[in-house]
A protein has these predicted regions:
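Helix-loop boundary and gating motifs at the non-cytosolic
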Residues: 1-52
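Transmembrane alpha-helix termini and helix-breaking/packing motifs in multi-pass membrane transporters
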Residues: 27-28, 32, 145-163
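Hydrophobic core of transmembrane alpha-helices in multi-pass small-molecule transporters
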Residues: 13, 81, 91-112
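Structural signature of the two symmetry-related core transmembrane helices
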Residues: 69-84
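Loop-to-transmembrane helix entry/capping segments in MFS-fold secondary transporters
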Residues: 37-38, 112-113, 125-137
Length: 163
């Protein structure tokens, strides 16, 4: 099997595990940080709007930038947003991180990764095996999201002080 297929599957599993984890923990973290429900809702809304704009820009530019570079740009934006959420509790800075970062407060793969990965996989997999690979691609993604949410739920219920 092409090693690029393994890389695409592996990064999807890691990313969707994190998205599932965030879907449980992020609102709790923001609440513990002192944000109101309105602020948390606004931050999530800005996150989704930012994801839509960044995704549109990256996916329409993916072939010009190169698909690998596009996936790396998305990963760097996601990492930057995560660092921003860890380092500050300033609402304006968190809003900026939410807008430009590619994170998913709802646990679904809504960023640029899905379309770029799928386009890449269609070039790496023969027509005869494509349905089989895409079935596994979706299954492992769903399983990773569910496992991440489960891990987030366990952590949220644990007696360990998180924030």
């Amino acid at each position: 099997m092409n090693p690029n297929i393994t890389i695409l599957f592996s990064t999807r599993i890691i990313r969707l595990f994190c998205y599932g984890f965030l879907s449980v923990i992020l609102a709790l973290y923001l609440s513990e940080a002192g944000f109101t429900e309105t602020q948390i809702g606004l931050l999530f809304t800005l996150t989704l709007l930012g994801d839509a704009v960044i995704s549109l820009w990256l996916t329409t530019s993916a072939d010009r930038f190169g698909r690998k570079r596009t996936l790396l740009i998305g990963a760097v934006l996601m990492m930057g947003a995560g660092i921003g959420f860890v380092l500050t509790k300033n609402f304006a800075l968190l809003a900026l991180a939410a807008i430009i970062g590619v994170i998913s407060p709802g646990g679904s793969d809504i960023g640029p990764f899905l379309s770029v990965e799928q386009a890449s996989l269609t070039q790496l997999i023969s027509n005869e095996k494509r349905t089989h690979f895409f079935a596994w691609y979706n299954l492992v993604g769903s399983f990773a999201t569910a496992t991440g949410a489960l891990a987030g739920g366990w952590l949220a219920q644990s007696p360990i002080v998180l924030f």
